[in-house]
Amino acid sequence: MNLYLIGHDYRYAAEQMLLTLFPDERPEYPDGRPTGDRAELRLMSGTKVTTVTCVLVYHGQTANGRTSVPNGELTDPAEKDRRLQGAVKRAFYRAAMGIGLPHRPWGMLTGVRPGKLMTPLLAQGLNDAQAARQFERQYDVSPARADLVVRTAHATLRAMESLGEKDVCLYVGIPFCPTRCAYCSFVSQSVEKSMALVPEFLQALAREIAATAEAVRRAGLHVVSLYIGGGTPTTLSARQLDALCTQLAAAFDLSALREFTVEAGRPDTITADKLQVLRAHRVDRISVNPQTLDDRVLDTIGRRHTAQDIYDALRLVRETGGFAVNMDLIAGLPGDTPDGFRATLEQVLALASENVTVHTLSRKRGSNLMAQDAPIPDGAAVGEMLDFAGIVLPRAGYAPYYLYRQKFMSGGFENVGWTRPGQENLYNICIMEELCSILAMGGGASTKLVRPNGGKLERHIDPKYPTEYIANIDRICAAKAELEAFFQ
């Protein structure tokens, strides 16, 4: 679609709304007179208000959108940019509703973290109903989504109250998987092709662990959560997992640790000896992720395991004991149906895991789904799946405790973590709501530095490919040595 920005250059805001409303369109910025399918977004500054208008032409239909912001609310430069970008989105959205686009569950919101908009409303004293109504009016969010974000915001507020200024989380990324799932765009390395890289990668990781631990010690930080993810960390052998956990315990002061999570994920990598190693190192949370319990769908997405493998892996976890278990599901997988998803969720509930995370399929660039153009359930079918989850999970004693959104999600929905009472994963809340710093190590790991007052945020990302990670380990460790300065 052609985009014409008149009187401003808020490209990012215009493009985010374009991708939200018209996910199959890509932005173009032609010169000359406006033609074709297009959005003309004009900003006009008056004496009292600044107005944004949108003329939208799409498939022979034309509609207009308009919104204004009082100039008295635009005195701070940073706030001015934020408000005017929001006005560009709002005018575009209103025009799109004028040509009859179906209402989207999250209305005009385009961001990853809707909870960051809700938490301040509750913190300033609004009750749940008031906050939900304001959210609906301001962003045209559906009542069901407004209620959902209110409930997750309460979990955020509880987590905020429990964190001290010096509290941080640690993340360790292991970028290896036994096979690559069709929906995945993370550049994890197939062990069949690159097992030879694992020992050298772990040697480099040990150096980064040491450098990070020294920065943590010098800054006087307290590690409250440790999360090993990937990839699939349990791709490593029991001996390698033991060595990694030993290094972490020796390098960091873990006396303040409140949880230790390992994203086992794939049942074909979970063995009794690995579980015993993890329990010996105080790991108390683990994921066993079916995504679906339909063998036909599992084969379609390249998982290379069966539903029975999930049952067997979970039995091993329960026999080992001491783990809170999360199980991931994905709504909208190729070949799945609302009935199939219902059957999977009912079977998962019968397994009584402490957490259930319901993801919506995101058609990520770089995934095999995008390359193959695989047929997937439409937004209406995905909506049925999520509506069912939203009914049966609370009935089974689960409450939503974190949520986030991604680009190219089927139906424009969301990912939601559900928990039994008292079983929330603090790390998930902290990273999604940016409550504290996440110090990350390993392949593709993203360090996120957050000021306690929320006023500053920095990101540092390690290389994804193991070969690049190994080659750049000197630079990576040097950057970790500079972390201390952020906390001064």
Regions flagged by a language model, labelled:
Residues 1-124, 128, 205, 421-488:
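Radical SAM enzyme core and accessory elements
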Residues 52-54, 172, 286-288:
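Short beta-strand motif preference
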Residues 188-389:
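Conserved non-cysteine loop/helix-boundary elements of the Radical SAM core domain that shape
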Residues 32, 36-37, 366-441:
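A C-terminal junction/extension of Radical SAM enzymes
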Residues 167-202:
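Canonical Radical SAM [4Fe-4S] cluster-binding loop centered on the CxxxCxxC motif
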Residues 30, 42-44, 173, 229, ...:
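Solvent-exposed beta-strand sheet faces enriched in polar/charged residues
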Residues 173, 287, 355-359, 429, ...:
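Beta-strand scaffold of nucleotide-dependent catalytic cores
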Residues 100-103, 123-170:
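N-terminal [4Fe-4S]-dependent radical SAM core
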